[in-house]
């Protein structure tokens, strides 16, 4: 017998069969190692995004830009921050407790303050530029540089009432739900020619399929008045709830979803919940807004737009505010080169396109409503001719910081001429 046999007796187990506890411990260790190997890089990625921002190349977001809203269909998550990185820009977005981008503005208006509420879509939201570069912030700075006159305001505040993907219906609902609480002295609506008419019409967007709509629409009744269709998005389910929590709280998850899965086409499991407007992609083509021969659906879309703008004006005026309309043009309306890319070498004559047509339509609506109207095409074209461009991003199609600066200056002049604001 080996001399060490008495010192180390054999284990009383069946030969060739490891103990049950040992097997469990082995598997627990293996699972722990796998989880550690998976989680440690994610935790490191989470920490690096929070400390350094978008340090990795590529196009992605480190947070969620929009969440579902029971009244507007969608809006910004409150008290949320994220980075947005694209080929053309990188921006940091911070929302306040009310869901607006930028600093918090108290609801109660301080004495001596003149407030301007700006309603609009992604051009007001302006996620393509930094907070101080947005036209609403530049406008605020321009106005506050001129305070001090006898009997005038001691401060101007421009209140953010914009969100990407909104149409005039959502802007009206925001005015009623939140905007009027700020006691604005003036309400400006920034109307984007490119898609606001289509956003206002369920016929243009979804062929009238109400069951696909998950944002609010106003639709005509037989008597010509408008009926509000409330949003009815599908419930997200368990996986949807988990994903929404991760989108709100994990930079790494947002990076993986927006920067990896989306590119691989593997992020559509929850697409119905994430979709902002509808359960299917809106069908209207933005270029049709330039067509001078209106089909029935476009004629209806313009009529709905006319009625909605009147409702916004009435709501503002009834609560003691003045109201103005600002036309935000497309890149093709400002740049001749961009217009040729849309309409062809003949400028759209053969296709029946006129890039000034939507402007004339909106100007007629403003005249009917007795509403001061500013068309931003002339100042933007003049600035482009003077070499101040680029005013729009080529791919993203929204204003650059230079475009926002031109808009702010033009709106400032408009306010002085119409209401002596800032003079």
Where do the model's predicted regions map?
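N-terminal secretory targeting modules
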Residues: 2-115, 130, 181-185, 198-201, ...
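Serine-dependent acyl-ester chemistry module
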Residues: 8, 133, 153, 192-365, ...
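A conserved hydrophobic secondary-structure block that centers on an alpha-helix together
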Residues: 151-180
């Amino acid at each position: 017998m080996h001399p060490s046999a008495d010192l180390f007796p054999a284990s009383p187990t069946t030969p060739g069969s490891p103990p049950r506890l040992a097997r469990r411990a082995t598997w627990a260790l293996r699972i722990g190692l796998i989880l550690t190997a998976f989680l440690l890089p994610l935790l490191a990625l989470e920490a690096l995004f929070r400390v350094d921002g978008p340090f990795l190349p590529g196009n992605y977001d480190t947070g969620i830009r929009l969440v579902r809203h029971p009244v507007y269909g969608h809006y910004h998550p409150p008290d949320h921050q994220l980075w947005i990185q694209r080929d053309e820009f990188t921006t940091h977005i911070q929302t306040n407790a009310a869901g607006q981008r930028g600093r918090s503005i108290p609801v109660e208006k301080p004495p001596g303050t003149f407030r301007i509420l700006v309603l609009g879509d992604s051009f007001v939201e302006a996620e393509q530029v930094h907070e101080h570069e947005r036209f609403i912030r530049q406008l605020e700075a321009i106005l506050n540089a001129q305070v001090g006159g006898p009997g005038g305001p001691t401060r101007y505040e421009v209140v953010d009432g914009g969100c990407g993907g909104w149409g005039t219906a959502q802007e009206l609902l925001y005015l009623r739900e939140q905007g009027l609480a700020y006691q604005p002295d003036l309400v400006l609506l920034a109307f984007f020619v490119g898609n606001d008419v289509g956003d206002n019409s369920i016929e243009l967007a979804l062929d009238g399929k109400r069951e696909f709509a998950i944002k609010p629409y106003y639709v005509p009744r037989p008597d010509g008045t408008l009926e509000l269709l409330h949003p009815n998005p599908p419930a997200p389910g368990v996986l949807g709830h988990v994903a929404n929590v991760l989108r709100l709280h994990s930079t790494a998850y947002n990076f993986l979803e927006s920067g990896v899965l989306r590119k691989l086409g593997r992020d559509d499991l929850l697409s119905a919940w994430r979709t902002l407007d509808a359960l299917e992609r809106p069908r209207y083509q933005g270029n049709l807004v330039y067509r001078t021969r209106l089909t029935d659906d476009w004629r209806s879309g313009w009529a709905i737009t006319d009625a909605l703008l009147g409702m916004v004006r009435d709501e503002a005026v009834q609560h003691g505010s003045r109201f103005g309309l600002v036309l935000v043009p497309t890149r093709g309306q400002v740049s001749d080169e961009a217009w040729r890319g849309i309409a062809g070498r003949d400028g759209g004559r053969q296709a029946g396109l006129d890039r000034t047509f939507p402007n004339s339509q909106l100007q007629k609506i403003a005249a009917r409503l007795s509403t001061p109207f500013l068309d931003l095409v002339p100042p933007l074209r003049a600035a482009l001719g003077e070499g101040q461009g680029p005013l729009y991003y080529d791919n993203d199609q929204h204003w650059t910081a230079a475009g926002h600066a031109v808009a702010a200056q033009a709106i400032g002049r408009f306010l002085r001429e119409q209401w002596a604001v800032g003079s």
